[in-house]
Amino acid sequence: MSTTISTQRGQVYIGELPQDFLRITPPQQQQQVQLDAQAAQQLQYGESLGTVRRLSITVVQAKLAKNYGMTRMDPYCRVRLGYAVYETPTAHNGAKNPRWNKVIQCTVPPGVDSFYLEIFDERAFSMDDRIAWTHVTIPEGLREGSVVDEWYSLSGRQGDDKEGMINLVMSYANMTAGMHMSPPVVLMPTVYQQGVGYIPIAGVPTVYNQGMVPMGMPAAPTVAPQEAPCSEEDLKALQDMFPNLDREVIRTVIEAQQGNKDAAINTLLQMTEEL
């Protein structure tokens, strides 16, 4: 507790000063405005106190307009989001109806609201042939926790939106900032045949593998993200209820609903109604 004594220059405090000494307390309305501004900034970047957005993209299948292979066609997908590139496994002899069912987990940098998807025909003795592509805008509904199952038109040599369709399932989840899906594996320039409508980006190296590969970052120890609980028992039960849906699609829906079985069932029912 402080005491006051008088000197020639006036009164002075001796001892511990009060917490609000020489502080001007802003009015309550101004404090509320500052809190609202901070909350709006967090919502703008889609994150809050140490969390970043993670986008789950399930590349299910495609229905292509033409088989460009001499004897067979082995398609695979490449997804470019920000400065990272992801690839699916090759659907060997997938021809015009390849199925991948590949789940891609990736972080979304601030300001990025879309990704670029390409389909290649894997060649054994020549450059891989780029046969189809599309630009996908990330649906706004994902921010509210919904799961989007859509078919997107593909462009290619047949013309814009005339190369077929591709089925994607997308959802959002949060992960702790600083976690990495996997370290970089391959760094090399992209070389392949150019298709109609493709504009190459000169001077930008491409990083790719069958998982997350952030460009320009050193390798970091892999830390497993905290996934929503998804037991094999729940997965099998839902697979029995929805035999027409792929197992990995069901798993993605359960994880997107944070393990809530009832919410996952409602989402799967909506998906089956749209099929």
From Swiss-Prot:
Ubiquitous. One of its GO terms (biological process) is inflammatory response. It comes from the Eukaryota. Pfam families: C2, CUE. Residues 230-273 form the CUE domain. A motif (AIM2) lies at residues 151-154. It is found in: Cytoplasm. InterPro entries: C2_dom (IPR000008), C2_domain_sf (IPR035892), CUE (IPR003892), TOLIP_CUE (IPR041799), Tollip_C2 (IPR037301), UBA-like_sf (IPR009060). Coiled coil: none annotated. GO terms for cellular component: cytoplasm. GO terms for molecular function: ubiquitin binding; ubiquitin conjugating enzyme binding. Belongs to the tollip family. Both ATG8-interaction motifs (AIM1 and AIM2) are required for the association with ATG8 family proteins. This is Toll-interacting protein B. It comes from Oncorhynchus mykiss. The gene is tollipb.
